[in-house]
Curated annotation (Swiss-Prot):
<feature type="modified residue" description="Phosphoserine">
    <location>
        <position position="53"/>
    </location>
</feature>
<comment type="similarity">
    <text>Belongs to the globin family.</text>
</comment>
<dbReference type="Pfam" id="PF00042">
    <property type="entry name" value="Globin"/>
</dbReference>
<dbReference type="GO" id="GO:0005833">
    <property type="term" value="C:hemoglobin complex"/>
</dbReference>
<comment type="function">
    <text>The zeta chain is an alpha-type chain of mammalian embryonic hemoglobin.</text>
</comment>
<dbReference type="GO" id="GO:0046872">
    <property type="term" value="F:metal ion binding"/>
</dbReference>
<feature type="modified residue" description="N-acetylserine">
    <location>
        <position position="1"/>
    </location>
</feature>
<feature type="binding site" description="distal binding residue">
    <location>
        <position position="59"/>
    </location>
    <ligand>
        <name>heme b</name>
    </ligand>
</feature>
<feature type="domain" description="Globin">
    <location>
        <begin position="1"/>
        <end position="79"/>
    </location>
</feature>
<dbReference type="GO" id="GO:0031720">
    <property type="term" value="F:haptoglobin binding"/>
</dbReference>
<keyword id="KW-0597">Phosphoprotein</keyword>
<dbReference type="GO" id="GO:0020037">
    <property type="term" value="F:heme binding"/>
</dbReference>
<dbReference type="GO" id="GO:0042744">
    <property type="term" value="P:hydrogen peroxide catabolic process"/>
</dbReference>
<dbReference type="InterPro" id="IPR009050">
    <property type="entry name" value="Globin-like_sf"/>
</dbReference>
<keyword id="KW-0408">Iron</keyword>
<protein>
    <recommendedName>
        <fullName>Hemoglobin subunit zeta</fullName>
    </recommendedName>
</protein>
<dbReference type="GO" id="GO:0072562">
    <property type="term" value="C:blood microparticle"/>
</dbReference>
Length: 79
């Protein structure tokens, strides 16, 4: 489980990095409420490992997304 500080850092990074660095990615996540006070983000931030694991499996095995595109996402986290 994440600490409150770690959750705050991840939430700030997510909002500032991925959708700011790659605004075109918003088109793939129209159902995400990305506002600063989003109940959806607060509800799921402590379970981010599980959520990303399921997302990884979905992209790799069901949607068959080219792994090259994962570099864009990881870059957004690292920037």
């Amino acid at each position: 489980s994440l600490t409150k500080t770690x959750x705050t850092i991840i939430x700030a990074m997510w909002a500032k990095r991925l959708f700011t660095s790659y605004p075109q990615t918003k088109t793939y996540f129209p159902h995400f409420d990305l506002h600063p006070d989003s109940a959806q983000l607060r509800k799921n931030i402590d379970n981010i490992h599980s959520a990303l694991s399921k997302l990884s499996e979905l992209h790799a095995y069901i949607l068959r997304v080219d792994p090259v595109n994962f570099k864009l996402l990881s870059h957004x986290f690292l920037v």
